[in-house]
């Protein structure tokens, strides 16, 4: 079985959030561009202070709090340890999540895959 890409996971999460009437935004701080265009885009993002480490999603939960999700691809357990492709959470991403978790009525989580993100949302909504 092929593990979905991070973009495929993001599409699933976006569709689920829309279908369940959540107010949210996907922070577009990642993209693939040709090298020359990417260099110009990176300079523009830096001038605008767009953090490449900020969580991917900001969701207004139905109970009135905020949830930030850093979405990573699922872990592929079918590969050997040497061949395992894991989407690593950077030190800066962890720092962002820790900072956001210090704000009242706000929670930030790293989720490996759409299913984990959905479970996290439903769990937080239930408490």
What is the predicted role of each segment?
Residues 1-127:
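Catalytic phosphate/metal-binding cores of nucleic-acid and nucleotide-processing enzymes, i.e., regions
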């Amino acid at each position: 079985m092929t593990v979905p890409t991070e973009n495929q996971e993001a599409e699933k999460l976006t569709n689920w959030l829309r279908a369940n009437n959540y107010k949210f935004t996907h922070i577009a701080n990642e993209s693939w561009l040709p090298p020359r265009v990417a260099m110009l885009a990176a300079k523009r993002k830096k001038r605008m202070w767009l953090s490449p480490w900020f969580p991917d999603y900001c969701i207004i939960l139905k109970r009135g709090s905020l949830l930030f999700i850093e979405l990573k691809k699922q872990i592929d357990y079918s590969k050997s340890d040497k061949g395992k492709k894991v989407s690593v959470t950077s030190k800066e991403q962890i720092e962002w999540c820790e900072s956001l978790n210090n704000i009242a009525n706000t929670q930030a989580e790293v989720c490996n895959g759409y299913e984990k993100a959905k479970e996290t949302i439903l769990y937080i909504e239930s408490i």
